[in-house]
């Protein structure tokens, strides 16, 4: 009898145009598309991930960043085991808004493990990430840097999310 592969739901949240969909596509499909189409509501993809604990299937939920989708998003947070709060290194307000995103998610799942992700590293290679690190320290989580364009840090980010999700599932 084959063992069932656990499905772990994770969410990718942040303002519009920070690169959430691009990160997911880079990870799941291995590609980057220059053209941007805003996510309407939510979207999701799945990917098998091999961890030290065994294989898991990540169900990666892409949350639309526009304010008008807030009420809808809250329903989709349920059942999540981890979240990435993504900001654009070239857009400081997207980092400031992560506080709002965290609050919105915590309203639904108070103890959800999260990671702060600085995206678009390729556009700002010398940009200091101290403010992102300060936020991550303040909320007691990790801070990672990624580039959906080059792929830098993307696999590490999703592996970290998968490990957070496995840990959360075990403690629930």
Each language-model region and where it sits:
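Ras-like small GTPase catalytic G-domain
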Residues: 2-13, 17, 22-30, 45-172
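Short beta-strand-centered segment that lines the nucleotide-binding/catalytic pocket of NTP-utilizing
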Residues: 35-44
């Amino acid at each position: 009898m084959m063992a069932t592969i656990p499905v772990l739901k994770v969410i990718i949240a942040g303002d519009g145009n920070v690169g959430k969909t691009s990160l997911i596509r880079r990870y799941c499909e291995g590609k980057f598309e220059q053209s941007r189409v805003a996510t309407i509501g939510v979207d999701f993809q799945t990917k098998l991930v091999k961890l030290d604990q065994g294989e898991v299937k990540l169900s990666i939920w892409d949350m639309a960043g526009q304010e008008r989708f807030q009420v809808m998003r809250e329903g989709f947070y349920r059942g999540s085991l981890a979240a990435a709060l993504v900001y654009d290194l070239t857009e400081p307000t997207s980092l400031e808004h992560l506080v709002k995103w965290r609050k919105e998610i915590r309203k639904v799942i108070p103890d959800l493990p999260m990671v702060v992700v600085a995206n678009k590293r390729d556009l700002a290679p010398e940009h200091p990430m101290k403010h992102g690190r300060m936020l991550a320290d303040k909320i007691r989580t990790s801070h990672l840097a990624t580039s959906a364009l080059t792929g830098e840090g993307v696999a590490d980010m999703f592996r970290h999310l998968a490990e957070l999700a496995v840990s959360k599932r075990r403690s629930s």
